[in-house]
């Protein structure tokens, strides 16, 4: 059975039912460039950042919609005011024909309308323009402010104190050692050129004098012997007879220990007992006394 040219034309002799079946034993070979697919999935999972131009356009569109609603509201007030004025004029004409004096309620309505400013289309446009400027200022403030920094003006002095290290400490008696508000303010002329330079030179001179005095005291106290000799005498690993450190030996072996001390003792040879100098022979001169050179 073949469908659209796919499959066997007849199932006779094929050992199958003639339908195209899926081979479950087939192992699908995937492409080696699997990293590309993973990169695509990672990009799809990334959070999309909003375009600032689109967000600004959306804010301006909301501002224009608010302005349209505000203009419609003002125009409705103007139309209602005109209708009330027309009704009041008609009532005045009717009352003027019948009664010479209108009632008190109509007089109060006329006074309240005279107090309220009559709006025209030009006045409406002026009010709409003012409202637009106000909304644009609010939009600029929203751009300048950041989230989580509303109390920055309050926390800024505290951070400044922490960076400078002006922390209040309590004594045993409970008194404050350091307080920023109780510190004596520095004079205005403290950083003037002559006074500040003189004070700086005086402090540097004091520092040099103290250093020289301590140095002199140190060398006067140890002037009887050398500094290196004093270090060697205090160190146990050095001896006065030899400047080399002592040799480590096996303390469990008696023979090696005694041989080590025996080597250190002076021998009875004449070269060690007497301070005889080695005779220097001049090879250029003739031999004297039958010396064999």
UniProtKB/Swiss-Prot annotation:
GO annotation, cellular component aspect: cytoplasm; nucleus; Prp19 complex; U2-type spliceosomal complex
Pfam families linked: cwf21
Every CWF21 domain range: 55-98
Species for this entry: Schizosaccharomyces pombe (strain 972 / ATCC 24843)
Cellular compartment(s): Cytoplasm; Nucleus
Principal location class: cytoplasm
Positions carrying Phosphoserine: 118, 285-286
Entry function: Involved in pre-mRNA splicing. May function at or prior to the first catalytic step of splicing at the catalytic center of the spliceosome. May do so by stabilizing the catalytic center or the position of the RNA substrate.
GO BP field: mRNA cis splicing, via spliceosome
Gene that this sequence comes from: cwf21
Assembly mode: Belongs to the 40S cdc5-associated complex (or cwf complex), a spliceosome sub-complex reminiscent of a late-stage spliceosome composed of the U2, U5 and U6 snRNAs and at least brr2, cdc5, cwf2/prp3, cwf3/syf1, cwf4/syf3, cwf5/ecm2, spp42/cwf6, cwf7/spf27, cwf8, cwf9, cwf10, cwf11, cwf12, prp45/cwf13, cwf14, cwf15, cwf16, cwf17, cwf18, cwf19, cwf20, cwf21, cwf22, cwf23, cwf24, cwf25, cwf26, cyp7/cwf27, cwf28, cwf29/ist3, lea1, msl1, prp5/cwf1, prp10, prp12/sap130, prp17, prp22, sap61, sap62, sap114, sap145, slu7, smb1, smd1, smd3, smf1, smg1 and syf2.
UniProt-listed SMART domains: cwf21
Biased composition (Basic and acidic residues): 43-52, 106-119, 159-186, 195-214, 227-259
Keywords on record: Cytoplasm, mRNA processing, mRNA splicing, Nucleus, Phosphoprotein, Spliceosome
Designated name of the protein: Pre-mRNA-splicing factor cwf21
Similarity annotation: Belongs to the CWC21 family.
InterPro entries in the record: CWC21, mRNA_splic_Cwf21_dom
Region of interest: Disordered: 30-52, 80-119, 146-293
